[in-house]
């Protein structure tokens, strides 16, 4: 499955870990490059640094191909 997770906090990171473990293709979107770098170092996932509400970021993450899209950000 193609999974996009927006937000690399505690819950987002755990979901990235679980989906990655199951062999799914995971893309993480986070506005903080430190979080993207850390998660990319720990898991075999692609990271897009940017806002999950920005159309260019969503295009780069190929959101149109997602089977699952999870937004885990707080406002």
Regions found by a protein language model. Name each.
Residues 1-73:
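Cytosolic regulatory regions of ion transport systems
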């Amino acid at each position: 499955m193609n999974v996009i997770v927006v937000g690399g906090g505690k819950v987002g990171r755990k979901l990235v870990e679980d989906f990655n473990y199951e062999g799914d293709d995971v893309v993480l979107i986070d506005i903080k490059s430190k979080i993207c770098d850390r998660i990319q170092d720990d898991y075999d996932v692609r990271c897009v640094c940017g806002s999950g509400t920005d159309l260019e970021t969503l295009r780069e993450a190929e959101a149109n191909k997602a089977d699952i899209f999870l937004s885990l950000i707080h406002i």
